[in-house]
Amino acid sequence: MSAFDRIGVVGAGAWGTALANVAARAGRAVKLWSRDPAQVAEMAARRENARGLPGIALEAGVTPTADLREAAACEAVLLVVPAQVCRAVSGELAPLLAAGTPLVSCAKGIERGTAAFMTDVIRAAAPAARPMVLSGPSFADDVARGLPTAVTLAGEDGALAETLAAALGSSTFRLYHSSDVRGVEIGGAAKNVLAIAAGIVAGRRLGASAGAALTARGFAELQRFGRAFGAQPDTLTGLSGLGDLILTAGGPQSRNFAFGLALGQTGEVPQGGKLAEGAFTASALVAMAAGRGVEMPICAAVDAVLSGRLSVDGAIEALMARPQRAEA
């Protein structure tokens, strides 16, 4: 089996740049792709991605490129683009990839309109690739600076996931391998919506007690959803589930928390700014839950606020007015 000496990273935002540095620290030759030739030239000249991750030097093993073929020719490709453009970019990669190339989704979301998880999107758009997913509690800045981080890499072929995890791991970036692809994807998608709710609680200054209750009850929703879609319990309580929820719901370094914080402070849905995947995932997540009879009141409240059906205060009141019940 390939040792994965060459790694392609498609997407030169903050997370893509951080993962490119991760792979280079592990001794891999990395092609970091951006669609923008000017950004590529700037990264090559400055050895820094000033647009995506300023202040962090690119590792020596990272080669920026605007040629998608160079990234696609690598032995494994990390797809580090927003969830809602995963299908389009996977389609661009499809004719360039060798059959069986691992194509690893590093986005945390569900496609709007289709309610498809990212590995399903990859499977449809790039059928010759081997879909995988990388997820877990990780801020790009922490990872890029070499601070200790642990994540999960999942693929249907557990041996392949183990081999690729070993190829990307280092003394500061630990990858646990898994074959529970769906469980890892569910944790990454659901926690973003719950982090928006946590940000709203902070923005409304509802207190630490409310924040703790929100996180605990939100995790109960994540578990119910996961069970309904066949996730393994250990995955949901692991890095890609509970671990990522704790990180993302913990403060404004999280884009989704920051989005919710602004929403809670102003009562208005933020426009522009950094991408918050949870804002796009909420409606799909809630619809999927309803289709399986899964109760997710916190996520449904976030969706109602984002769609304008409820005000922030109205959503809080509705949650607190729910009938008393046993904890489960």
From Swiss-Prot:
Keywords: Cytoplasm, Lipid biosynthesis, Lipid metabolism, NAD, NADP, Nucleotide-binding, Oxidoreductase, Phospholipid biosynthesis, Phospholipid metabolism. NADPH binds at residues 15, 35, 108, 140, 255, 275, 277. SUPFAM superfamilies: 6-phosphogluconate dehydrogenase C-terminal domain-like, NAD(P)-binding Rossmann-fold domains. Pathway: Membrane lipid metabolism; glycerophospholipid metabolism. Transmembrane segments: none annotated. Its EC number is 1.1.1.94. GO terms for cellular component: cytosol. Belongs to the NAD-dependent glycerol-3-phosphate dehydrogenase family. This is Glycerol-3-phosphate dehydrogenase [NAD(P)+]. It comes from Azorhizobium caulinodans (strain ATCC 43989 / DSM 5975 / JCM 20966 / LMG 6465 / NBRC 14845 / NCIMB 13405 / ORS 571).
